[in-house]
Each structure stands twice: as C-alpha cells, then as structure tokens.
C-alpha cells in the first residue's frame, strides 16, 4: 500500500494574512528549520542559523539589464572594487604556474611565485601594451615575454630584459616591475581585487560567512568537471535565475516532487553574502496530497552518481520517509567512496541544497552530495551576453594524491549541458531549463511597457540584496587603476 507523503505540522511565523512586510511564510508548510530539526542526525550551528532581513518592496528598474551605459558604469565602478574568484590553487600548484583571468576589459596573469605567494599581474606589456599571455591561457613559465618586441619579466614581476636598452635611457628598470592587483586565498579559491583600498577579504565577506566556509574545508576538494557556456542575457539576469527556489515548480516540475521549494529558507549576511537552504527529500508544498513517499524517493536520484558509485534504486520501508532513507543511503555510499566516518555528519549536510552567493558573481554550493561552484562574467563587448561556468567538486582521495583539475569544456551556444562529458544527465536537464528562460527574459524586458521587476518580499530577497549591492557600487565614482600606486616588488 502506497504511503502518502508525510507533511510536518508547520508553525511558520507570519504565515497568517496581514503579517508585517517580509514576515509572511508559506502557509500550511513546515519551515526549513522544522524539517531539519526532525532529522535523525542533528545539523551544526551554521545550518541551524537564520538571518533574514526585509529590504524593501519597490520595483527594480529594468535599465540595469538593457542599457549599455549601465554596463560601462559596472566595469568602471563595480568590477574595479570587488573581490572576485579568479582560479583555484590547484590550477597553479607549482612555482611558475599561471592562469589568465579576465573581467571585462581587465586581464590578469594569476601566478604562483612561491609556496605561499600568489600574485595577480596586469596582463599587459609596459612597453606598448601588448598582452603578455592570451586570454584563457595557462601554463608554467620562467618568464613573461612580450610577443611584439621581446621585453620580458621574471615570474616575481621584476623586469628581466628591455631589448635595445640603450634606446630607453629615460626608463628606470627598477621601476619597471609588473603592477599587481590584491590577492587573497580562502578555501582553496584565489580571489583578486583591483582596488588597493579594498577591505581585506575576511572583512568583505563578514565573520559569520567566514566561519561557515571554514567548516566546509573546500580546500580539500578538487574540480573534476568544469563546464562553460555563453548565455544570451545580461550577467545579472543569469545570476538572479539561481537566487531563489520560487521558480522550481514551474521551471523544474520534475524536481518539485522531492524539493521543499516554497518553504525554502533565505538569509542575508552583510552587504556581500546571502544564502538559501532548500530541503530535499521532501514534497513541494505545491504538491501536497498528490504524491507518496515512494514517489519522492524514486525522483530524488539526481546528483553525482559517478562519485557515489552505486546506481541501485532504494525502496521505502513501512513507516519510513524518503528523506531519512536517502540520508542513510548517501551516508553509507560516501563513507565507502571516501573511506571515512560520516556518522556525525548531519542529514541536512548530506541532502540539502545550500547556495551561498559572494557578490558580485560567485556561488558556492557546499553540500556533501554535490558541491558546486558557479561563476558569471559579463561579456565586455555585449551587455546582453555573459559567460556562465559550473565547477563540480569531489573530495581529494584518501591517499592524499590530488587529481589534476578538469580542463574547461566550452559548450556551443546551441548545445545542451547534457552534452558535456561527465555531466549527470538529470542535472544537465535542470541547467538547460534554468538557462532556456534567460533569452526570453532579456527580450521581454526590452519589449516591456513596464519598466521594473516586481519581487517577492521573502523568496526573492536575495535578488533584492544583490541589486542593492549593485546600486551601492554604481553610486561611487569611476575607479581606474593608478599605476603610480600599484604594488610591484
């Protein structure tokens, strides 16, 4: 006999009509924290915390998505002041290793100079400006030589050679070191900031998020799949498509069977970080009364099947829940795959979708079952396009030998994410669904007689939080690199 999906009795604060702005929650459904509290293995403090703040309910102007002048202001004011994920430490493990990172018109050679010394050099010859390394390139170098006239620099940034130095008596080679951006490393991620006056990365992120990230130990993971694709929309629209679970029931109906979408939790941390927690292995409140616990269990099979190494379909015992069966199964499979004891790892960490955004363009999904990274970068030549990257991560093997990080797979505009070698087909379908909406949204905003986006107070608070940060930086003066102040050693 089929067992109807179990519904926890919800005590959602503010679910009643007339609640203060931002306090209304999905009526008749348990909160995310109530679902997690019922789990067999308790969740840690960083999971059990809440940090919502009502940020207003006015429309968001559409100009920021469709006006070329807005994109120019972003390059002059926003991208020159914010911390950005440039590469992983594993991309440049040896001294001399480098990878080129571009953002808009700016380009940097991210280089390992010493075991604990990573630098970000402006990717331009100080003679007549030619790029020292091509965009998208990587490798290992003993010097950076210009392909035009042959001027060269050591990997520590000092000038190595000026061809026909006799013709440049006015040039002091001691002052000819490559200028640099600021660099910091956190969780194996290399961040850069063009602004020399920018706060330290820890201050930019805030103490609470820093504590969360320290708990994940992402430096002990490696990138096993890296997929990139150009999207036909403004970079902010692409980011905002992933900031809420409100779209799940319409855009991903196949997932709603096992996703607590309308009762997901949304948090904001300071100016630059926000989060949602979306519980999995539970039925969407939109579908209450329409599915059994076995239906939930049957659907909830998306994820990194390659890492799990087990394709068997689980079944539900009498009185059991899909969520608990999946937690037990995931725990056992990951213990076997990683030769580790996960008995103290909470059910929530094993199952649920945790999505953190670091402004302006970096997503971290630190869950055990499918840790991922998203990065979005605007196209410097067309504000209606952006580059979307998905990086999937796995634990470093128990023998400590770190595999080589995956080379990026660049999909054509007309290709499905499912065509990327190594992509889980179910998850690839979800990414296709997410991104297929974006061209229609970009065109719709340009055609609309309504010049604003209307947002929900709770479920879309991350969109508003993100756009408030955009507004903060665009209210500042343009900031361009000043070579007289740039550090060089």
What are these regions (language model features)?
Residues 40-69, 133-148, 177-187, 299-337:
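N-terminal short leaders/motifs
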Residues 2-3, 7, 20-136, 181-185:
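N-terminal pre-ligand scaffold of iron-sulfur
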Residues 3-9, 13, 17, 21-28, ...:
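C-terminal catalytic domain of Rieske-type non-heme iron oxygenases
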Residues 2, 92-215:
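Rieske [2Fe-2S] iron-sulfur-binding domain
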Residues 61-62, 87-88, 172, 200, ...:
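Short, solvent-exposed coil/turn linker segments
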């Amino acid at each position: 006999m089929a067992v109807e999906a179990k519904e926890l009795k919800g005590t959602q604060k503010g679910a009643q009509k007339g609640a203060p702005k931002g306090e209304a929650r999905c009526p008749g459904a348990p909160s995310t924290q109530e679902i997690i509290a019922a789990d067999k293995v308790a969740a840690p403090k960083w999971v059990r915390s809440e940090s919502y703040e009502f940020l207003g309910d006015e429309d968001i102007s559409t100009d920021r998505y469709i006006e070329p002048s807005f994109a120019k202001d972003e390059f002059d004011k926003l991208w020159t002041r914010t911390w950005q994920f440039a590469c992983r430490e594993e991309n440049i493990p040896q001294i001399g290793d480098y990878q080129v990172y571009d953002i808009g018109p700016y380009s940097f050679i991210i280089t390992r100079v010493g075991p604990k010394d990573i630098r970000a050099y402006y990717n331009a010859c100080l003679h007549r400006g030619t790029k020292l390394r091509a965009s998208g390139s990587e490798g290992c170098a003993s010097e950076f030589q210009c392909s035009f006239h042959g001027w060269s620099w050591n990997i520590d940034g000092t000038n190595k050679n000026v061809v026909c130095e006799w013709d440049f008596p006015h040039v002091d080679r001691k002052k000819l070191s490559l200028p640099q951006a600021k660099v910091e490393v956190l969780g194996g991620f290399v961040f850069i900031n063009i602004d020399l006056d920018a706060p330290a990365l820890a201050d930019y992120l805030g103490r609470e998020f820093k504590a969360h990230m320290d708990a994940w130990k992402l430096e002990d993971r490696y990138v096993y799949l890296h997929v990139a694709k150009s999207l036909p929309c403004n970079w902010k629209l692409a980011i905002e498509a992933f900031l809420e679970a409100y779209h799940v029931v319409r855009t991903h109906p196949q997932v709603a069977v096992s996703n607590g979408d309308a009762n997901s939790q949304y948090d904001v941390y300071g100016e630059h970080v926000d989060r949602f927690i979306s519980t999995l292995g539970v039925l969407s409140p939109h579908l209450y009364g329409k599915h059994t616990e076995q239906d939930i269990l049957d659907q909830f099979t998306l994820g990194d099947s390659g890492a799990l190494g087990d394709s068997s379909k689980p079944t539900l015992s009498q009185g059991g829940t899909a969520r608990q069966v999946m937690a037990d199964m995931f725990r056992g499979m990951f213990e076997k795959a990683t030769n580790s004891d996960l008995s103290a790892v909470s059910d929530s960490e094993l199952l649920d979708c945790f999505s953190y955004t670091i402004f302006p363009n970096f997503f971290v999904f630190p869950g055990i079952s499918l840790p991922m990274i998203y990065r979005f970068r605007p196209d410097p030549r067309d504000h209606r396009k952006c580059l979307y990257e998905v990086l999937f991560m796995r634990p470093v093997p128990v023998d400590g030998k770190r595999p080589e990080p995956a080379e990026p797979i660049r999909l054509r505009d007309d290709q499905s994410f499912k065509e990327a070698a190594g992509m889980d087909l179910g998850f690839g379908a979800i990414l296709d669904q997410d991104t297929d909406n974006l061209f229609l949204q970009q065109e719709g905003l340009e055609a609309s007689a309504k010049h604003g986006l209307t947002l929900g107070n709770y479920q879309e608070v991350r969109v508003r939080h993100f756009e408030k940060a955009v507004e903060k930086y665009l209210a500042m003066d343009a900031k361009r690199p000043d070579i007289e102040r740039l550090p060089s050693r």
